[in-house]
Amino acid sequence: MFSHNRRKLLQASGAILAAGAMSSPLRAQTAAPRVVVIGGGFAGATVAKYVRLWNPKIQVTLIEPNPNHVSCILSNLVMTGALGMTDITLRYDNLRTKYGVNIVADRAVAIDPVGRKVSTQNGSQIAYDKLVLAPGIDFDAVPGLDSAV
């Protein structure tokens, strides 16, 4: 009789341990995935917007040091007088209010791919499950560009 009870106790203990071991991965899968986008130009802002549109459960954070984005594509219309600078200046507030994107007004300075964290200039660390790099281009940093133009 004792061995029968002990066997049931061991089976129950094993089942409890197995359930406990499985609950961590299940819990991790049920947590909202975190996507961090570095760069708020056309590419970064578009990725942030559409990830939220396709799956509103995903937490999207956009890291961008500038308060708004000036559309270089539309700059010819400013030169001709058809539009003003305010017309081609896009604010990141729309991503926050319309799509639920978390905007971090800071500069990304380091990426820890093992720990899955982005460090910002102000000392924040932002965790991610998926990372999108869309920093754009800095024409001033292209060697020889000034002398070529």
Spans of model-derived segments:
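A generic secondary-structure boundary signal that marks alpha-helix termini
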Residues: 18-19, 56
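FAD-binding core/adjacent interface of flavoenzyme oxidoreductases
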Residues: 2-14, 20-32, 103-149
